[in-house]
Amino acid sequence: MLYLHLETVEDIFHAIEEIVAKVRESDKDRLVTILVDSLAAASTNVEMEADFDKDGWATSKAIIISKAMRKITQMIGRQQIALVFTNQLRQKLGVMFGDPWTTSGGKALPFHSSTRIRLKNTGQIKDKKNNTIGMKMRAQVIKNRLGPPMRHA
């Protein structure tokens, strides 16, 4: 297991490339899972250097993710690598019909994902002393190229 604390989107995707290359050099059949938590919290190099009152820096994350996902999906496409991203839901303002929720970072992640699962907190699990010891969650498969979509657990 390898843990990295990376602050920018660029650093995250460079690290993914390096991990995939090194693992494939040593063992081509090894099962690998790479978890990125959380993409919404990561900044870009432009955001880190820019002033908040200047326009244009907010879209740079989506552009970087789009370019990186095209490259990464080609690298891991036919290998035994699971790339898992956690992201945050944001509410779209003024939506009258359809899903009012979206994820940050543009449309590249939803497009390139083979499976997307939305988790929702539905309650708490408490012990006999009424201390919270866990959370009840609902999982909804909202995209699945590997099986039937729109299932719940």
Residue ranges and their predicted role:
Residues 57-153:
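Phosphate-binding/switch region of NTP-binding enzymes
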Residues 1-71:
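Conserved inter-motif catalytic segment of the P-loop NTP-binding fold
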